[in-house]
Amino acid sequence: MRSMKIILCAIFFLTGLSSFASADVNWRQFEGTTLNGIYFTANYIDAWFRPMAKKFEKETGIKVRFQVLVGPQMRKKQDIMLAGKDPQLDLVMLQMDNRGGKLTAAGHLEDLEPYLKDSSLTPSNYDYPGDWLGGCLNTEKVIMGQPMNNIVWSAQAQLLHIRADLFKKYNVKVPTTMEELEDAARKLTIDENGDGKPEVYGYLSRGWGRLTTASFASYLFNFGGSWFKTRPDGSKVSNINSKESVDAFEFYGRMIRDYAPKSALSNKPPQNAALYAAGKAAMLSALNYWHGLADDPKKSRISGKSTTILVPAGRAGSFPNIPTTSLAISKYSNNKKAAWLYIAWMTQKHIMLAGQKAAVPMCRKSSWTDASYNPPTPAWGKSAQIAADYGIAIAKPQAIAIGQIRDLAGEVMNIAIRDGRRSAIQAEADKAAKKINEIVAKTEKGMDFSGALPKFAKKLNQSDQLAPIKAEGLHNLGN
């Protein structure tokens, strides 16, 4: 019922948006233009992009046609059109931590700074970067010296989904540290009939190869590890075989091996989310987007029983992982000014607030603080906002040859989960690091591809780590 109310409120809000348009920009200056974009499949396409495209066309006279494809197909189609300098491609949707380095290095994305400064194209109240959350801004540039070639608009977050009802029933402390996380997973692995097949598993996360890099990132950095490090001479080398990184691999592997169902070894995020919604796990490490499935009374057995908190801190601190999504303009577009007008319109305060109300986590501060916005749960709102403000988007190793390097990191994780011996993990990490260094030496000469590293992030303090738990009234459990 609550989800339906949120959707209805969002629909009513969307119908009245045109009256909010900024008067200092002539929104109809490119009337009759058609823009083409290639976007990837996501919940926000139907929840926000399609209704907004209709509003945009009504207000500006510009038609937006976007082809929506699953990730691999989208990337292939974008690559073909960009490599061919196809002028028919205007708008590019991308995650900078996944595609930004490659497309920036190739020179495929337009520098947006001149458009941002043009008062005829950008509303005077646009408030960039002032109204953008810090973590989102950290993700826009992945190569040092990179031009401002994208506008980040949405920030999903890798959070810990928890069954609040089970934590209350068994009086288990809601975790703020990695040690407490494992303790909670142990206590909430529930085998009621003693047959060795738990009715509820304590923990669930991605457990298959390269896909684990996205969910593993927060654990890696919280333990003090990293994908890469910089030598004194400035060269970039792999760091996945450092003590801290191997500690993280070992911990994450043990959590999957000891407290998750065997299907986690091959599941993709949708399958894990479905298991959690079916009541088969007490905790799920996944994007905050999946809360919608867990809270849907038509699809979930745990509707009203789940919320989200930040991934617990490690010995190095807490670095929330926020896979952000950006909009960019093809360098070869024939409609660059009209394309920027679309981006500027879509990322105005009132338009992004509409997305926020349609359950799409936005990168504007005002979207979170507006008095009319009500999050799905208090803890979901707090954890998602804190992650977007403090987080870093380095779910995947920042490199041109990102696919190859994710595969190598995935092999280390496979050993961590299936074998678990420290010596075996270290040996695989050493082997992977050597191969990664060879790849980087061939593909990234002359580049400072540092990405949004923890050293650039704001330090998350203990009170922030605890804030979502307090917001849900769960902070006194386990005492």
Name these PLM-found stretches.
Residues L137-W153, Q158, E182-V237, A281:
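Extracytoplasmic/periplasmic solute-binding protein
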Residues D24-Q29, R99-A157, S215, Y219, ...:
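Hinge/lid segment of periplasmic solute-binding proteins
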Residues P51, K55-W132, D165-T176, A274-L275, ...:
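Extracytoplasmic "Venus flytrap"/periplasmic binding protein-like
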Residues A184-K187, R231-L265, T307, V311:
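Glycine-centered hinge/linker elements that transmit conformational signals in sensory
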